[in-house]
């Protein structure tokens, strides 16, 4: 085969003006910094989000917002959470559901109180009254809410921003008082002296959800011998039976027999009132070779001997129950106590098998002490300082100098067996980042035991995504103790109780609760601090107001946020209770999910949600937590607007941030960083450029005038619609399952593999070269119009700004002014032609195989454009043979279409092998031969045709192009 040269380049006329070139106002660059706010202003001006949420015909969908804390700048965790919620809400809106998303903020608590205090000098702090502090805290919270709200709005989040819920709002506080009151009247609230997690740095009790367990905590652990001064006769008899005689006199006995205990909190030893054993464990009296006997768990005897570096030989073995009643003397104080039977918490996993018991400083200790009638001794004040009850250790701080002084005293007394450092999980105050302690105080508790079974039943009725969430919260609720809900702070919702000044009797009844609730509903919680008892007490007690004092405790902030269902989803218009969905980080199984569940079940016997969906945490690209010290913090606003160095931190816009959220499997922790953002930006550009190409080819297309009926479309166009239908089905399923990473993958593959690299690549010729009204061009435009409308709608929940920009640049009337008014994309049944799927897949694979051979020719510089090539095919597989026969049965036009699909100038199927080949490939699919195409290059369409030069008016054009020019 030969290929001839056409006219010299400088003699060729230009046919550029005869081609159908792209025309669109949809730019290649998003210019997101300017364009996104314009689109957001358009939505607000038209009221599209709120009107759609109110006027949609479908049922209500309520995604109840877990309130972020009103303090600090927004971070990637906020972005992950709020964008996920927005994607879901926008999808439900487009499905026709009524959606009113009410954003919330958690506004009470210590961090805000500390911020207020930090902004004041010592003199100002001393002059600060509780009500002044509350006013300043409220002002600070409102300012923080305003800043965070502006950030959320810039991300394209749709919400009822003018009517958010804040836990400091009076209607919210009143609803919370109602929740507390109902629980109290049902018997679920009580006051008691009990060990609680206490933060000396905050000087308040903490709930489990307010604790964190940082890595690397080390405690000074000690093994201590308590001298035994008396044995029960029953134990003495059992020891004698084993050949072990012990002295009867207590002073002699104490010199030779010790109870060995182990503790990681030496500062609690002044509060020791017992040693506890497990009645079912074996214990031995072991001789250390120096005439000293130690009582330890038999199973631990060898390991303790190794630790103490002294031989221990068991002389007698008894059950734990036999040890009960042994009397020992405190090694540091003038106090005698007894060994008692504890519980299953006493094991042989660590320590000695005998547990130092201080009922004022541990839950197990407290429960054991209560069982045996021990007093609750707590010689530690609110600052963590030992009191006079600690004897010579008074004034020492338990987290500073107390441990060292007590260890030194143990050594001086000869009771210290061993001291060593011990690394373990230890609770810290999540706000101050300082260690906490267990400390018995008078607190208010929610008794979970009263409704635990109901709560577990409610958990079973909820859909947990991922499913592991159910086991997680189920085990937490099953095992959790009573909930300490009181805090010794000023900035919060008051616990509405009164105490009889002389007796301490508590007033908490339906009248007092109703009266306080009504006052707070009208005036807000500040009234508790502004008014005296005479105004706060119900009418039945006003005459004796002088006998009562109001409480000073406030409620745990988890009780605040955990009551949101009562104030928001069950009371506000356009919402539903239980809510359809709660969506927060996986840490909220122990936080908001649980506090909301407990309050809702306690009050109404039902969970406040139907489905709970959790996400992981945002990490850097190396999988590390973000921190200023590591310098790896990614700021969502820098992603959107760019950093100081725009080359290193370019402005990507909100849609790239949103695309990141859709791209990750958020059920686990998710990475984000500069490299990931660059990759996402590339994907964003591909989607945008694909959309631009579709729009640019529709500038002269009006569907009502130019559209071709589906049944009259060529095979490739019908296949493209069939493929679009399949992809849209898969995208819809991904949204329904909240698997947005599948949407991301489907979108990327559809825009790149199906459209850009296949359909649109093939369509260029008929789009550019055909006469404007040619059926082959109008057919392609028909498909492009149908696709761009549905593509815009399908990406709208995620790429909301791009979708709206596409919609506003569709050059023909769409019937709706916003993509969000167009509804979730659906496809007519006539698009679904399964007969096209298999043969077209074979032909796509054939195209890939041909492209591979053509690319080899290009790489060896045997070819420039693929249009310089002619290709002969010979099918090898039955499937491809069937596909080619199927194609031939559709007529010559479709066979010629295959040539266009391959982007070559000539195509031969079957026949004799060619000579003068550029390349060939005999693979499993087909024999592929490539030669130079015959004829000359058309100056307009660039195809090589044999009829070039036969048309005097256009000697450089092929017959097809001459015909087009005659019709233009």
From Swiss-Prot:
Pfam family, one: tRNA-synt_1
Cofactor binding note of this UniProt entry: Binds 1 zinc ion per subunit.
Catalytic activity reported: tRNA(Ile) + L-isoleucine + ATP = L-isoleucyl-tRNA(Ile) + AMP + diphosphate
Highest taxon, organism lineage: Bacteria
Residues where ATP binds: 628
Main location: cytoplasm
Record keywords, A-Z: Aminoacyl-tRNA synthetase, ATP-binding, Cytoplasm, Ligase, Metal-binding, Nucleotide-binding, Protein biosynthesis, Zinc
Entry-linked InterPro entries: aa-tRNA-synth_I_CS (IPR001412), aa-tRNA-synth_Ia (IPR002300), Anticodon_Ile_BEm (IPR033708), Ile-tRNA-ligase (IPR002301), Ile-tRNA-ligase_type1 (IPR023585), Ile-tRNA_ligase (IPR050081), M/V/L/I-tRNA-synth_anticd-bd (IPR013155), Rossmann-like_a/b/a_fold (IPR014729)
Enzyme class: ligase
'HIGH' region, short sequence motif: residues: 68-78
Keyword Iron: no
SUPFAM superfamilies attached to this UniProt entry: Anticodon-binding domain of a subclass of class I aminoacyl-tRNA synthetases, Nucleotidylyl transferase, ValRS/IleRS/LeuRS editing domain
Motif ('KMSKS' region): 625-629
EC number(s) given by UniProt: 6.1.1.5
Gene Ontology molecular function, alphabetical: aminoacyl-tRNA deacylase activity; ATP binding; isoleucine-tRNA ligase activity; tRNA binding; zinc ion binding
Residues the record lists as binding L-isoleucyl-5'-AMP: 584
GO terms for cellular component: cytoplasm
Gene Ontology process terms (BP): isoleucyl-tRNA aminoacylation
Subcellular location: Cytoplasm
Cofactors demanded by this protein: Zn(2+)
Subunit description: Monomer.
Family: Belongs to the class-I aminoacyl-tRNA synthetase family. IleS type 1 subfamily.
Entry remark concerning the domains of this protein: IleRS has two distinct active sites: one for aminoacylation and one for editing. The misactivated valine is translocated from the active site to the editing site, which sterically excludes the correctly activated isoleucine. The single editing site contains two valyl binding pockets, one specific for each substrate (Val-AMP or Val-tRNA(Ile)).
PANTHER family in alphabetical order: ISOLEUCINE--TRNA LIGASE, MITOCHONDRIAL (PTHR42765:SF1), SOLEUCYL-TRNA SYNTHETASE (PTHR42765)
General function of this protein: Catalyzes the attachment of isoleucine to tRNA(Ile). As IleRS can inadvertently accommodate and process structurally similar amino acids such as valine, to avoid such errors it has two additional distinct tRNA(Ile)-dependent editing activities. One activity is designated as 'pretransfer' editing and involves the hydrolysis of activated Val-AMP. The other activity is designated 'posttransfer' editing and involves deacylation of mischarged Val-tRNA(Ile).
Protein name, entry field: Isoleucine--tRNA ligase
Organism: Synechococcus sp. (strain CC9311)
Native organism taxonomy: Bacteria, Bacillati, Cyanobacteriota, Cyanophyceae, Synechococcales
Name of the gene encoding the protein in the UniProt record: ileS
